[in-house]
C-alpha cells in the first residue's frame, strides 16, 4: 500500500525497542495503559511525555526510548481503545448487527470522554483497529454492496457516533445561548422556513432526546449508503 512521501512509518511498523544495550523496562502496552489513565482522569491535554514518564517514575528522556513522539503515544492510546470491543457473531440481520456495534462505539466514547474528538481529528488504524474493520466487514459479508461502500459505512458509523458523543458532552449553557440567538434572529422575518420549523418550540431538543434517536439515525444512514441486502 503506497504511503505519503516523507511520512513517518506507523509506530506499529517500527520495532519495539529500548535503549541500545539495555533491557526493556516497560512495554508499549504498559506505557499506553498509564497514558490512558491520565487521559481518562484529567483529559487529553494532561497527556504529555513528561507526565506519563513521571507516572512511571522516570524522566521523559527515558520514555523516548520506547515511544518517539506524543503523536505516537496518542496513536497507541486510540488503538488500545479498539481492543475494548466485544465482537458478537453475525445474526443474519446486518443492520441490527451494525447498530449493536455502534452502541459499543458509543459506550467506549462515553468511557473515554477524550476519544471522540481525537478520533475525528486524528483517525488512526493500528492492530486493534484493523481487527475491528475485519469484524465490521464480517457482519456485512453477505451484503451485496461493494467494498468502497462498506468502508464508507464504517467511516460514517464511527464519525456519526463520535458526533453524538461530543453532543452529549456539550455544555447545556451553550445550547441555551444558541437557542436564545435563534429566537432573536427569527424576529427579523428573513428566515421563514426556519421560523415555521421552530414555531412553538420552547427550546431546542435536549441532548438526551437526540441520543434517543441514535439507532434510528444510524439505521437510515447505513441503509442509504449500503442499500438493501
Report residues per predicted region.
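Hydrophobic alpha-helical connector segments
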Residues: 86-128, 157
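A structured, mid-to-C-terminal "fold-capping" secondary-structure block
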Residues: 2-3, 176-229
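Short, residue-level hotspots on alpha-helical faces of the histone-fold
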Residues: 76, 80, 156-159, 163, ...
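Hydrophobic alpha-helical bundle segments that form small-molecule/ligand-binding pockets
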Residues: 132-183, 225-229
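Helix-turn-helix
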Residues: 30, 34, 38-71, 76
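Alpha-helical structural segments
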Residues: 30-37, 41, 72-87, 100-104, ...
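N-terminal intrinsically disordered/low-complexity leader segments
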Residues: 1-26, 192-204
Amino acid at each position: 500500500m503506497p504511503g505519503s512521501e516523507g511520512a513517518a512509518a506507523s509506530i506499529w511498523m517500527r520495532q519495539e525497542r529500548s535503549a541500545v544495550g539495555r533491557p526493556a523496562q516497560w512495554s508499549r502496552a504498559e506505557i499506553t495503559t498509564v497514558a490512558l489513565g491520565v487521559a481518562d482522569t484529567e483529559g487529553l491535554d494532561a497527556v504529555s511525555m513528561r507526565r506519563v514518564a513521571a507516572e512511571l517514575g522516570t524522566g521523559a528522556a527515558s520514555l523516548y526510548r520506547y515511544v518517539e513522539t506524543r503523536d505516537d503515544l496518542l496513536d497507541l492510546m486510540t488503538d488500545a481503545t479498539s481492543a475494548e470491543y466485544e465482537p458478537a457473531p453475525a445474526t443474519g440481520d446486518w443492520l441490527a448487527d451494525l447498530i449493536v456495534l455502534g452502541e459499543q462505539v458509543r459506550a467506549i466514547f462515553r468511557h473515554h470522554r477524550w476519544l471522540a474528538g481525537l478520533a475525528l481529528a486524528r483517525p488512526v488504524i493500528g492492530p486493534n483497529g484493523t481487527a475491528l474493520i475485519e469484524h465490521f466487514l464480517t457482519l456485512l459479508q453477505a451484503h451485496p454492496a461493494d467494498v468502497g461502500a462498506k468502508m464508507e459505512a464504517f467511516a460514517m458509523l464511527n464519525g456519526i457516533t463520535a458526533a453524538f458523543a461530543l453532543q452529549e458532552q456539550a455544555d447545556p449553557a451553550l445550547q441555551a445561548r444558541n437557542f436564545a440567538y435563534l429566537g432573536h434572529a427569527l424576529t427579523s422575518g428573513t428566515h421563514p422556513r426556519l421560523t415555521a420549523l421552530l414555531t412553538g418550540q420552547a427550546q431546542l431538543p435536549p441532548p438526551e432526546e437526540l441520543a434517543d434517536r441514535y439507532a434510528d439515525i444510524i439505521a437510515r444512514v447505513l441503509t442509504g449508503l449500503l442499500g438493501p441486502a
